[in-house]
Each structure stands twice: as C-alpha cells, then as structure tokens.
C-alpha cells in the first residue's frame, strides 16, 4: 500500500484536495502533509474521519483554514486528535457529522470533533453534530484526558449531546455559542476520585443553550471536582437545571444570566413545584439520575458555586438555586428571582456528598433575591444562610416536616444578617438568627429559636396593608442590643408583640409607628412579654421617648411581671407668666360643650397631629388673623385729617409676630404678613364728612409648632367701611369684612413620619371705632379712642393623613379696646406736614372660645383675657394728594402676645 501511495505522489502533481481525500480514505495522512487549508473533505463509512492525527504521526502545528469537513457513518468523526505533541489550528471552517457515534446503546463518548490528546485551536468555526440525540451521544465537541486541550473563539458548537469535557482536559471558549445540548464537564467519581482527574473550563462572553428536544438534563453540568469559570454570557434551558454542580465541582459565574427559556422543562410537574417530593438525582452525560420536579437555575450538591453580578431567573415551577448536602454557594451582587417559587431550596443528590455535610449559602455585595419563599428546607443536614454587605432578600424561610431517620439527627437552620443586609419575610423554621447592623422585615407571625441583635440590628414588624393584622414574634431566647419597629391598632386595642419564652437579656429599643386612631379603652397596650425576672430592658426609640397614638402621647412602662406596655404620658409644664400649679396636679374641669363629648384627661400630652389640629382650629387662630387685617383706622387710612374733604385710593402692608397659648394645645408662634387695597369717596355733610369705601386683601399666617413642624393659613378677604370725621375732632369708623381661610399643617410625629391635615373655613366680622381729638394751638393733640370688634369663625371637619378625625366647631370673638394717642402735627415747607404719635391701649377679649374635637374628644380653646398694647407711628402729607404712614406696635398678654407689628401704607387723595 505504501508503495502504491509513493508512486502516486511521484507520478503527477495531483491537486491538494484530491490527495487529501485519497489519504483520508486510507485512514491517515502522510507525514509529508502539515495542513488541510481551503479543502472540502467529505467522508462516508464506519470510522471514516475527516482529519485524524494519530499518536504515531509527527507532532507540531498543523492548520486547516477555510476547510469544510462533512462525515457520515457509524463512529465517524470530523476531527480526531490523539497526538499529545500535535496542535491543530482550525479557522474559518466547518465540521459536520451525521453518523451514529454510539455502539448498540453502549456510549463511546465520541464527538463530531474529538480531542483525546494534543491541542485544538478553533477560530470562527462551526462544529455541528446533526444526526444524534443526547441519549445517543450527539456530541459536537468531546475533549477528554489530561493531555487534551482546546481553545475555541468566535465559534458555534452545536449538537444534541452538547460539549463534553472530562478526565483532566483543559478547555477555553471565548465569544462563542454552545447550542442545543449544553456544556458538560467531568464525570461522576467512583469510590476512588483520584481515578478521574478534574477538568478545567473557562468561558468568556459565551452563551450556552440546551433545548428541550436535546434531552439534556442541564444546560451546564460540572461534576467530579472539575472547575468551570464563566465571565459573561447566557445559560439557557436544560430539562431540570440551568447549571448543575456535583461531587466536589467548583463553579465561578460572573456576569452570567441563567434562565430556563420559553419551552417548558421536561421535568416540570403541572400545578406547581413540589420541593418535598424531589427525587435525589444528578446531571451529566449518561442520564445517571432521574430528572427532578420543577426547574432549578443552579443545582449544587457537594460542590462550590460562586455567582458574581449574575442573574438567575426561575419559572413558576422551580427554584433559582437548589442546594444539596455539602453545597457551598456564594452570591455577590446580581439577582435571584423566583416570583412564584423558591429562591433557594434544599434537596438534590445526597448520595454524592459526605454524610451530614452542612449546606452554606451566602448573599453579599448588594445581591438581590425575591421569591415566594427565600429558603425551602427539605433536608436534615445543617443549613447556614448568610446575608451581608447590603444584600436584599424577600421571601419566607420555611421547612417541611423532616423525617426521623435512625442514627441521624436534624441539623440546625441558622440565619445571619449583617452589614446593612435586609431580609423581608416570615419564618417558623429558623433555629438561630443573628442580626448585626442589618434588618429583618417580619411580614407575618414568626418563631425563632435564638435571636441575637447587635450594632443597631433591627426587627421591623411590617406595617400591614389591613388594619388589625398585627403580628407576634415568639423567640426562645433574646440577647444583644437591637431595635424592634412595631405597630399599634389603638382603636382595636391590639398591637404587635414580642414574646420571649425562656430567657431575655440585653438592652433593646422599641420604635412604635404613630397611629391616628384612639385606643378602644383606657387599658394599656402590651408590646413585650418576657419571663419573670429576665434581665432585658426596653426603652422607646421614638422622639423624646414617647409615641403618638390618636390624640395623646404614650410612654413605655414595665409592670414588674416581665411585661412592657404603652401608658399615657403626662404633659410637661409649659413656661407661662401666670402662676403654674405643682407637678402633675389634677386640672380644674373644662367647661362642657352643649352636646356631650369625651373630655381630655387632666395633664395628658397631646400628640403632634392633635396639637396641630387644636392650634389650627377654634376661633383663636382665625380671629388673630382677622384682627391683624382690621386694626385701627389710622393704620388703614393714614391720617385723613391731613387731606380734608378728599376721597382717594390706598394700599398698605403689614407684618406681625404672634405668640399664642389657647390653653388646649401647646404654645406656638405665628408670623402674619399681608396687604390690603382700598378706595373711598368723600361726602361732605354738615359739620364734617363721610368716607365710604371698599377694600380687599390677602394675609398669610405661618405657624411653628416647637419640635413638631408647622402649618399655615391663607386668608382672602373683602369688605367695606364708612368713616365719619367731624370738624369738632370727633370720628367714627365702621367696617364689615368677610374672609375665606385655607388652613393646613404638616408635623412630624414621634416616629419621624410626616402627618398632614388641611381644611377650609370662613369668617365674618365687624368693627366700630370712635374717638375725639383735642388739639392745642402749637400742634400737639390728645385723642382718646374706643373700639369694639365682633368676629365669627366657621368650622370644618377633616381627617389627617394618619387617620386622626378632626372636627372644628369654630367660635366667636368679642374684642374691646380703650386707647389714648398723643402726637404733634408739624408743618413743613410747601404745605407738607408730618404727624408723629405714640399710643397706648388696653384690649379685652370677652369671648374667644371655641371647641376642636379629635377622635371625638373635645378640646376647648380660648383666648379670653386682657392685654396691653404700645405703639408709635408717623403720618406724612407730601403734597399734591400724596401721603405716607408707618407704625410699630408691641402687645403683651397671658394668652396672646405680639412682640412686633409693622405697618406701612400709601394714600393718594383726589
């Protein structure tokens, strides 16, 4: 035969393609050939390989660029590399096989391209097995042996059997696609693992797919201490899992996306995943275990898997990650999603891991997990779940009733939250839970064996969407130092509760969310129950150590029997100029309204919302705004005597600071500012003249509630006036004014959250002022004054943002004033005049009372009392009908003080 080939070579310069086909038909290439470039190789027949580099062939680098290989026939392989010293570089070509690679059902683990020794470098290539299924070893690339290597780039590897790497092989795949049958690394070890050396595979920016038709149990399987590193890419499909790692495998996945794909998984069970019914099994070539119920993004048993900045999405039937005996999973960043199933589930191939090997799962570096259950436990092995580094996980932690197996024990389920991690869910399955600078948002009643908190670790009883759905946390032991955020349902007499069954220690704080509803009775609200004699202490973390509930504030108190409850807080004595009673005495009874209404208990401190509602309502606030708008004649019209017999138009602005104590709410300050515009017509009559006019204005009052927040009122008013000035010095001024007031407030409750309230009301008032000026020849004058004003404020009803019900009944004010003004008229050149003055008045509020109800509890506000007022001002006639006026006032009383009031105005007379 060799002589025949020698003669052919010497006889004629045959074309390379024809010669290659002839040599391929004999099963081996001659040593004289170093490459197969730009060829089309077609083979048919048993074991007819397209390119076959045997161990006896010379080593070195060989190339096949731009080459197409097609083979068909039993166990025919497009490329078979068996020489450890050889390297085949296959670029810009394709290899296709369509023959049966198995032998009467006996697996031979052959591929369209097989590397048993040596190195394959494939670039921009297509390797396709188009004739077989997973069960018949339809493998596109098979690399096996410690002397076998492959480096694939920018290529497509397609076959129902996928890509198989085992027995110590090393493979690198970049920017490529492995389609149909997935990627499978390693094999199950025997009892002597050293018999099967681990393989190592590196994928970079490579997608792996296992379609249902291929029958591949997993899109990627890593077995028997083999190692996979993937950086970038999508893993899709698999009958039962996206990635399976078993028996000592090591998997590193970075920037990966793992999902099932559109087609249903072959192992899916209609009606939902059945974790408790999972059958132990595994994945890999050969179908060495039954397919499990549901689909798992990552299935780990006796192996280590690291996911970094990766996405795992589980369908309705399945879990994002399943962990079996001895599994170690670390998730750094990225997300795990199982909206209708379990994020993490225990189960899998127990027989391929050491007996009672613990399971460890860590979510860190901002990893996010979300599912109906965060962890579903069905194995008795010890489980440790750790959330740290800002990880955020949602879902319950649950367990099936684990069977009792003779000679074995059920290991603990331990959970650790640390470093700003957050878990949202409920549990009755956790044996120990530690929370260190992290948060557990408890969504339902829960039971924990041992709870330990540190570094402001907190348990947040989730605010319910439905009132009355309170929650109870029951623990055997409590230790450390932490924070519990709780809810109360005062109108139902219910609250969240912490119950410690065996031992409680440490210093803990309770933060209670505000409630706008009123307690159903005077009974206390129980928050914590500890065993009698426990060393644990509890304090309120709310502002000032008090909780706003409905109308009043509450504090935390222990009753000596291990119970910690909310009880009514006494109001601190407010600094007032009037004599104050001793600490916490019974206060005199308040006047009863006409209709019976609950009265506030003596000495109780109002909540922030109730205090704001009381101070915003009633007649007191509205009347002080109305009087700021009204004020005296001289500040409204200037000095009419400076321009006799003349009508005109005018405008004025004013600003005032008020300090109010209505005896129902806490003292507060209000700053008032506004303006008025008006015009009048002068009508001469015998002995004097009338000024008849109209006015309109806007006023804003800004309130500050010390330590709570504030509010404001916008007032728009219109009115008319009639002023009579007699030649004898007597004057009479009458006004009628109607106002519309828009009131609101925004305060911070004791829990730090804002509470808002607003409503609209109206007011109407009238005033009558009279006086007489006595003038001296040198310009000095003396003017006694008297004024009576009546104002009626309407009411309103509304509900604050926290649910506090408020009803303002409005009220009436009757204010009298007696004053004396002293000044001097100074004549200037050009007919101009200046008239400075000083004034002193005494004011008496005869009524000023109103009632504000919060949750049906009546609070009577009143500003009745006397105050003094001092002022100075100046009016100036500038000639040609122009005049200016300005004033300053100071007023002081026990319930209403005005440290400063400024007015300035201008009038033009014609």
Swiss-Prot record:
Organism superkingdom: Bacteria
Domain Autotransporter, chain residue ranges per copy: 642-910
Keyword line: Cell adhesion, Cell outer membrane, Membrane, Periplasm, Repeat, Secreted, Signal, Transmembrane, Transmembrane beta strand, Virulence
Region of interest (Disordered), ranges: 565-605
Entry keyword annotation includes Repeat: yes
Location of region: 5 X 5 AA tandem repeats of G-G-A-V-P: 266-290
Single GO biological process annotation from the record: cell adhesion
Site feature location: Cleavage: 631-632
Gene Ontology CC terms: cell outer membrane; cell surface; extracellular region; periplasmic space
Sequence motif Cell attachment site, residues: 260-262
Sequence repeats by residue range: 266-270, 271-275, 276-280, 281-285, 286-290
InterPro entries recorded: Autotransporte_beta, Autotransporte_beta_dom_sf, Autotransporter_adhesion, Autotransporter_pectin_lyase_C, OM_autotransptr_brl_dom, Pectin_lyase_fold/virulence, Pertactin, Pertactin_central
Region (5 X 3 AA tandem repeats of P-Q-P): 579-593
Biased composition (Pro residues): 572-601
Signal peptide from the UniProt entry: 1-34
Subunit and partners: Monomer.
Role: Agglutinogen that binds to eukaryotic cells; a process mediated by the R-G-D sequence. Pertactin may have a role in bacterial adhesion, and thus play a role in virulence. May contribute to the disease state of whooping cough.
Note: Synthesized only in the presence of low Mg(2+) concentration.
Domain remark in the UniProt entry: The signal peptide, cleaved at the inner membrane, guides the autotransporter protein to the periplasmic space. Then, insertion of the C-terminal translocator domain in the outer membrane forms a hydrophilic pore for the translocation of the passenger domain to the bacterial cell surface, with subsequent cleavage.
Name of the protein in its database record: Pertactin autotransporter
Gene name as annotated: prn
